[in-house]
């Protein structure tokens, strides 16, 4: 309808303005910084030096133009259909050395932290779901271009696998799928040094690829050591294999920082003012912990914008966000218009299908998909509900537009945020798998990959404390008592 046309025009205008701003900025960066570096790299090479230089400069120019535009637009749950620039809503996050380090001095990241990275060169940023790891990486990437700190490359680690190593992924990004960029030229550039590699989302690598990707990172860093490497992940055991990286954590938001974030979400408007006043009233101290996490602050804004009530439990946050997305007029149009759902599912049936999809993604250990992969997962979910009449293509369309729990990234599709998938999976375990509930929870608890399930189990504890205690707390305490009796009461642990 007319609203969609208006939205598309506004979106197009925003994108056009962004492109007009980015093009000269990137051209200056390439001309004044990148090309002289490349000229230095190629001056010792016999043959078609000039041609290589032009080709390389052009490829990097196109890559930076595309990447700068892409990472400048924030993809967050708070702005379902509104274009927002990352720099406009970014609240500076702070890094501190990981827990086992005595130096607790926080380093505020409002730009690329040159001093920090000159000192450590290889930095690992680990933190739990929703602390803003990817946002932090994008902010630093943009600043490297703004202030000419080096030649940056942004690698999403979930794209790396046995048939697509780091070097190949960069050459594909620079040359396009049909015309890969010359890897020899790249290797020469990387060996020269002064490049900055942003490796984002180690925890999003499918488990069957973890070992390959870990080795690939180590090998890559060893072969081209005179560069800067920044890697992000949720805490995972396999990270021990990257011992030559200095680990940092993201500091929790202070209350004033979370209020600042809320104000930025509606440009100092009435919703944030009302919400902040309620939070300051002292009646909601039980959710103070939620205010420490940028993702939960975002969810709080979305939930409150929709219903003007403050959810007191994490899973109710997510449910209220889902409700807000489903009745999307509250978030984007400001009137009674609701997006048409091509699947024709009502909110309860849509929720039921999403729970199954969330669990299926958990079972397959996937959060990013090709179109065929995602349609296959929807087919699997649909087969479990023969009484529901919808096509997989219709639901996919809804998941990208009407109820955008997924977003498209080039030829790939992914959850808007991994924690949404974990919420639906946790709900599925509680509501839809009564006969297997104990077995599923026990399997998660006994998994070698329990680190990967911490956020899901945290959500599950909120939803079903009794089931959590029975299947996780009780076995943990029993194992502890057994260990204690065998090692201490028997005296075997005594000298």
Residue ranges of each PLM-predicted region?
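Alpha-helical repeat scaffolds in large eukaryotic proteins
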Residues: 26, 30, 207, 358, ...
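Extended helical regulatory/linker subdomains that flank P-loop NTPase cores
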Residues: 79-87, 97-105, 122, 273, ...
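Extended amphipathic alpha-helical scaffold segments
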Residues: 428, 432-495
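Short, mixed-charge aromatic SLiMs
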Residues: 160-161, 165, 196, 317-331, ...
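Short linear capping/connector segments at secondary-structure termini
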Residues: 277-281, 335-340, 441-443
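P-loop NTPase catalytic cores that bind/hydrolyze ATP
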Residues: 133, 288-325, 347-365, 418-427, ...
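P-loop NTPase signaling cores
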Residues: 3, 7, 12-81, 85-87, ...
């Amino acid at each position: 309808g007319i609203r969609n046309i208006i939205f598309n025009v506004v979106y197009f205008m925003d994108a056009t303005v962004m492109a007009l701003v980015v093009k000269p900025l990137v051209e200056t960066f390439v001309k004044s910084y990148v090309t002289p570096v490349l000229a230095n790299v190629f001056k010792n090479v016999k043959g078609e030096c000039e041609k290589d230089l032009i080709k390389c400069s052009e490829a990097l120019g196109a890559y930076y133009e595309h990447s700068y535009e892409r990472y400048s637009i924030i993809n967050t749950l708070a702005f379902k259909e509104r274009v927002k620039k990352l720099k406009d809503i970014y609240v500076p996050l702070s890094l501190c050395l990981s827990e086992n380090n005595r130096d607790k001095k926080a380093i505020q990241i409002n730009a690329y932290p040159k001093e920090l990275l000159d000192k450590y060169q290889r930095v690992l940023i680990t933190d739990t779901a929703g602390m803003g790891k990817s946002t932090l990486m994008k902010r630093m990437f943009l600043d490297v271009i703004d202030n000419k700190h080096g030649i940056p490359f942004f690698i999403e680690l979930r794209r790396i696998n046995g048939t697509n190593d780091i070097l190949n992924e960069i050459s594909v990004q620079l040359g396009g799928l049909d015309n890969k960029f010359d890897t020899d030229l790249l290797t020469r550039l990387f060996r020269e040094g002064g490049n900055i590699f942003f490796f984002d989302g180690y925890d999003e690598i499918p488990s069957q690829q973890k070992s390959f990707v870990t080795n690939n990172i180590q090998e890559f860093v060893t072969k081209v050591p005179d560069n800067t490497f920044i890697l992000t992940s949720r805490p995972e055991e396999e990270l021990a294999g990257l011992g030559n990286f200095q680990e940092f954590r993201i500091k929790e938001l202070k209350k004033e920082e979370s209020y600042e974030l809320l104000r930025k979400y509606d440009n100092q408007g009435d919703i944030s003012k009302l919400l902040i006043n309620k939070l300051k009233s002292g009646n909601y101290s039980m959710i103070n912990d939620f205010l420490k996490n940028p993702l939960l602050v975002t969810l709080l804004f979305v939930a409150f914008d929709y219903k003007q009530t403050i959810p007191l439990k994490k899973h109710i946050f997510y449910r209220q966000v889902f409700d807000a997305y489903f009745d999307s007029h509250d978030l984007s149009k400001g009137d009674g218009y609701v997006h048409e759902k091509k699947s024709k599912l009502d909110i309860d049936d849509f929720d039921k299908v999403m729970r199954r999809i969330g669990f299926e993604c958990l079972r397959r250990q996937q959060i990013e998909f090709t179109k065929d992969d995602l349609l296959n997962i929807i087919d699997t979910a649909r087969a479990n509900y023969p009484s529901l009449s919808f096509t997989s293509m219709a639901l996919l369309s809804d998941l990208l537009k009407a109820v955008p729990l997924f977003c498209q990234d080039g030829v790939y599709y992914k959850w808007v945020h991994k924690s949404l998938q974990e919420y639906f999976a946790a709900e599925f375990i509680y509501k839809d798998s009564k006969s297997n509930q104990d077995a599923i929870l026990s399997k998660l608890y006994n998994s070698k990959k329990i680190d990967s399930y911490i956020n899901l189990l945290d959500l599950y504890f909120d939803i079903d404390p009794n089931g959590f205690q029975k299947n996780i707390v009780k076995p943990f305490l029993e194992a502890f008592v057994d260990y204690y009796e065998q090692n201490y009461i028997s005296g075997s642990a005594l000298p």
